[in-house]
């Protein structure tokens, strides 16, 4: 993609990024951070080595995604809205580590789809769907 086209797309997107989208994007980052904490807690509390490694890989991959997403959201919105990620962690917690992590990941996917639909509705992006 030519630089001029990329700049045009950026400015088009910047014009449609409103408070609603910024709030959704802040929730996205908060949910990533909550997933990080959840997976890290499960990593520490895992009773067997396989689960210990699984949750370590999960929290390490989520950490990189959360950092990249937060930087982009701050670039678009100027700041992250306050979202209580600790309440999110509590809402994801369960007795079974694997099941609660899967449920949290499913909730994250739903949020990501909601954000994508909202941004697509504003005709800012389209990745062929």
Stretches found by the model and what they are:
Residues 14, 18, 30-37, 44, ...:
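Amphipathic, alpha-helical segments enriched in basic
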Residues 49-83:
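Conserved alpha-helical segments that form or flank metal/cofactor-binding pockets of metalloenzymes
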Residues 25-28, 85-129:
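Acidic/histidine-rich alpha-helical segments that form the ligand environment
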Residues 10-11, 49, 55, 92, ...:
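Phenylalanine-focused residue identity feature
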